[in-house]
């Protein structure tokens, strides 16, 4: 898979690591970013071991992973079996790096796990304060205070992401017999922040801290380490 230059892939672990004992809480991953998290490589270029899971052997637009369940950009908190599929208008049988990540996690865990994903192409963390349109991941307090989730007609992707996670917790994860644990935050994004690249680290750190804070408030668990 060929990725655009200057993209950043960050894996932020919120727990000690994966333990495959079935008696432990169910594993949950949260994933966010822009086009290269949503997926921009045709499914025809999927690795052969993923193509083997397809039910459509022409365009590889349909199929299902055995264990991975995903809620992706739906705002409803509903999980379905994962298959690489971009959330965009037009052709959406496209994949991103996480398709490979989830495949190998399946091989490791050999049990059901859940992914909450929100990804939109052409977006940035740093907001444009003068823009009437646009969608941003910013957690800057002064900007976030006046923002609304994109799922409600606003321009905050971060608030939409938080809403999606909370909905998934309320509708599914909190009802699991063995409980759940958010193990990791996958983030892949970068080039749309080029104009404010010097601020990128601080903006990303602030955004991650906001997600951790909201999850601690929601679950009572400390995700600060």
Positions of PLM-derived features:
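Sec/Tat signal peptide C-region and signal peptidase I cleavage site
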Residues: 18-22
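N-terminal secretory signal peptides that target proteins for export/translocation
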Residues: 1-4
């Amino acid at each position: 898979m060929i990725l655009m230059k200057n993209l950043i892939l960050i894996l932020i672990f919120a727990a000690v690591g994966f333990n495959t004992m079935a008696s432990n809480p169910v594993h949950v991953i949260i994933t966010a970013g822009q086009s290269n998290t949503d997926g921009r490589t045709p499914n025809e270029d999927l690795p052969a071991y993923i193509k083997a899971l397809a039910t459509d052997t022409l365009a590889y637009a349909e199929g299902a992973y055995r264990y991975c369940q995903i809620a992706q950009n739906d705002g409803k908190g509903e999980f379905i079996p994962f298959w690489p599929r971009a959330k965009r208008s037009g052709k959406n049988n496209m994949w991103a790096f996480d398709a490979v990540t989830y495949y190998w996690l399946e091989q490791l865990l050999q049990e059901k796990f859940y992914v909450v994903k929100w990804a939109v192409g052409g977006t940035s963390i740093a907001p444009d304060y003068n823009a009437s349109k646009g969608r941003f991941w910013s957690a800057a307090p002064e900007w976030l205070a006046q923002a609304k989730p994109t799922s409600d007609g606003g321009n905050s992707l971060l608030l939409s992401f938080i809403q999606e996670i909370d909905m998934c917790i309320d509708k599914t994860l909190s009802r699991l017999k063995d409980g759940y644990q958010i193990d990791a935050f996958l983030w892949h994004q970068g080039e749309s922040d080029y104009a404010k690249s010097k601020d990128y680290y601080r903006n990303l750190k602030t955004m991650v801290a906001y997600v951790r804070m909201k999850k601690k408030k929601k679950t009572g668990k400390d995700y600060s380490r």
